[in-house]
């Protein structure tokens, strides 16, 4: 009796464990794109969903699109979902999940993968826009440099004009002072002459002394020597 009870208890525990295991959700898978999640239009890309178990069924879904669904069974732990001739409408966020043969519950959803589909026309326009922006920047920089150069030349020219005008005014001032200096020197020489003439104690100038000396010499030559009368009396 006791043995039968124990066997039934063990059987119940095992069945309960199996049921619990079936209802347990598997861990979430991983989703990635190959060769890249950013692709050009009309090209191909493959989304790969990888699970933690083998012999599973995978499902691929798209965010904000409840009607999109792809299922795929695989004996491995990975499934591939190829996309060919991509269109802009294929862009969006994708996620995947899986379930094992022993479990009827889907696993947790994988992290969302953002698939970006670029337009070739936009890619062709992008370099031209970059080139235009660079050209505009170079043109603006050149204009600013030219303006600064002209401003520097103008400032240098104005400074040179100011210095030359200062030199000319200085020269004019010096030239205007020369006649005044000459007149002052002439007045000074006249004053010196007058002072010399007034400094003589007898009040006789150099010209008067010369005239009197000449007249005295002439009177001395006209007078006869004192011995001439005696020589005449003896001769008679």
From Swiss-Prot:
Transmembrane segments: 136-156
GO cellular component, one term: extracellular space
Keyword field contains Membrane: yes
Highest taxon listed in the record's lineage: Eukaryota
Residue ranges that the Swiss-Prot or TrEMBL entry lists as coiled coil: none
Disulfide bond positions: 49-96
All ranges on the Extracellular side of the membrane: 17-135
Region (Disordered): 166-200, 215-236
Protein name as it appears in the record: V-set and transmembrane domain-containing protein 1
Source species taxonomy: Eukaryota, Metazoa, Chordata, Craniata, Vertebrata
């Amino acid at each position: 009796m006791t043995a039968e009870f124990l066997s039934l208890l063990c059987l119940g525990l095992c069945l309960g464990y199996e049921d619990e295991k079936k209802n347990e959700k598997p861990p979430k898978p991983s989703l990635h794109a190959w060769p890249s999640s950013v692709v050009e239009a009309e090209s191909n890309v493959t989304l790969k969903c990888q699970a933690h178990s083998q012999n599973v069924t995978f499902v691929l879904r798209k965010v904000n699109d409840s009607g999109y669904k792809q299922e795929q069974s695989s004996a491995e732990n990975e499934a591939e979902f190829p996309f060919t001739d991509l269109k802009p409408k294929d862009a969006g966020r994708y996620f995947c999940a899986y379930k094992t043969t022993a479990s009827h519950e889907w696993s947790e959803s994988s992290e969302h993968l953002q698939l970006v589909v670029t337009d070739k026309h936009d890619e062709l326009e992008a370099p031209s826009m970059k080139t235009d922006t660079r050209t505009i920047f170079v043109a603006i920089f050149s204009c600013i440099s030219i303006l600064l150069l002209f401003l520097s030349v103008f400032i240098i020219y104005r400074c040179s004009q100011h210095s030359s005008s200062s030199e000319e005014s200085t020269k004019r001032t010096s030239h205007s002072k020369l006649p005044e200096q000459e007149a002052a020197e002439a007045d000074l020489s006249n004053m010196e002459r007058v002072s010399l003439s007034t400094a003589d104690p007898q009040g006789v100038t150099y010209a008067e002394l010369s005239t009197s000396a000449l007249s005295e010499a002439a009177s001395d030559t006209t007078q006869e020597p004192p011995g001439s009368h005696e020589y005449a009396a003896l001769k008679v």
